[in-house]
Amino acid sequence: MSLDWFEPFTLSTPLAIRAMECLFALSAGIQTLEYLRMRPAMNAQGLWSWAIQRQDIPNALAQKFFDGLFAESIFTLLLWARLAALLSLVLFGANLGNVTFLFVSNLFVLIRWRGAFNGGSDFMTLVVLTGLLISQWVGFFENSELGWRACFWYITIQSMTSYFVSGAVKLLRPEWRNGSAMTIFLNAAIHGPLHAGHALRKPWLSTLGSWTFILWECAAPLALFDTRLAVVFCCIAAIFHFLVFWFFGLNRFFWAWVASFPAIVWCAGQINILAS
């Protein structure tokens, strides 16, 4: 695929598939390594002991099943198997076996953490993984092309809706419209409160920054009308998510959302084809 910014272009399906497989594997791999690193906190004496969390499950049979699954040695084995499946995704591509295992194991991990360990990144991880699952099962019952089309559109609709809703919610909140919310959030960042002379303590600058985010998020669906717009949108989104990582330490937030970008660019290209 050659890029000519003066002419509309499309992202080929094989390239979009390969990019998403590799980006998702990187994203989920980082998450899995984090879980392995946190094993001491998940044992019986740890902060996230299963003995406490199991009380959220009322069904005795389900409790017994998860007691076995979330035993330290078994859960560790599950995480290593998850890394192996992600490696196979990079080396051999998506197939019914590795994607289904990754989806089911991801649900188990979410149950272990009461639904979401890291908020939005877990949501987007599940969205991309669900898209991959759709691609394989639709491909199994129908055909591969239809499966990947359904995958990309599912991920894109979920992603664009998330951006738009986030912007719309900010638009309705007075603290975002007047810029104070940005200062409040940054004061709670990992680098500590903004110092007294920091530029973002100036009301006009924090208001400008807030409105920039609001307008960008609300305009997200417009990126689908041209592949070039989609690429620019994804570049801006990558910068935004990197800043979230930089200020708040949410590293998996960056990779989880970047993994959805190939689907967005691909879908924009399909709209270009339909419009031509």
What positions do the PLM features span?
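Alpha-helical membrane-anchoring segments
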Residues: 1-276
